[in-house]
Amino acid sequence: MTLRRDPITGRWIVNTEQAEQPEKAQALKEAETCPFCGGSEALTPREIFALRPKDSKPDSPGWEVRVVPSFSPALRIEGELNRRAELMYDLMNAVGAHEIVIETPGHVANLADLELTQIEKVVKTYILRVADLKKDERFRSVVVFKNYGGDVVRHSHSQIIATPVTPKNLKEELNGSKDYYGYKERCIYCDIIKQEMQQSKRVVFENESFLGIAPFASRFPYEVWLLPKKHSFAFETITEKELPFLAVAFKTILKKLQKLLNDPPYSFVLHSSPNLREKSGYWQTIKYDYHWHFEIMPQAIESSGFEWGTGFYLNPTTPEEVATQLRQEEVTF
């Protein structure tokens, strides 16, 4: 397994061990017992972390949220990076981490259907795992993401991947945020939040601590961003007081999408500060210019070759229409 850098765009590509993956996926599909349910701990790799009572043992029932290594990891925790070149091309070993967050011991498919207290525990697990992985100096970025719908295992789970390089999309956000800060000495995300709250027309949801918006330049139909109202560059700095508000925001937005779009497949991704290094010139203003957030993207339409080839997105909806529809969709829990 290797990481290869595109010398033109700077994008990194992971060459995974694809030969193993179809067999593993097929075995999971054909399994009579869900490996993520409570009581099936022996069917997964040994747990890395779990929220569980102090008197319970690892890899045993009784847990609330459980984290295990991926069955088919994109990156492997063992080894050194061994950065090297093949003439003009850069590559390194595919060293990183790839973890599965099993969000509940009960056989529930969608995060939106979990109780608020359980979603709060899931988010707490994200925070603890991100903070722990950032202690490893080999890793530059830690990404939390979820793909709902079409999963091999129909049991609510998400994933965490730690990479030894900063993903290209995140680097573009960091550079754009830094440029804006250089001009105005303000966080661009804080300015977006201020304007969206003033105009209201793209606001989907808000509470004391968090704001959900249909972004002005939405790439996908019903795309929603979830941001902390208070400036914060790193996700793992969330306080205990803010956790319940984030759980409510997550559940409300996901339930609205579930109801309006008839339980669509969706993805969400955490965008947060990379693992900072004490290095001259290395994003010295990031604590002031960047703002962590989640991007939630229902898969309402398929991307076309034009979009893949150009970076232009064809979106048949406007964020103003989307926000109006989602605001009007009443949910109770």
Features from the language model and the residues they span:
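HIT superfamily nucleotide-processing domains
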Residues: 1-333
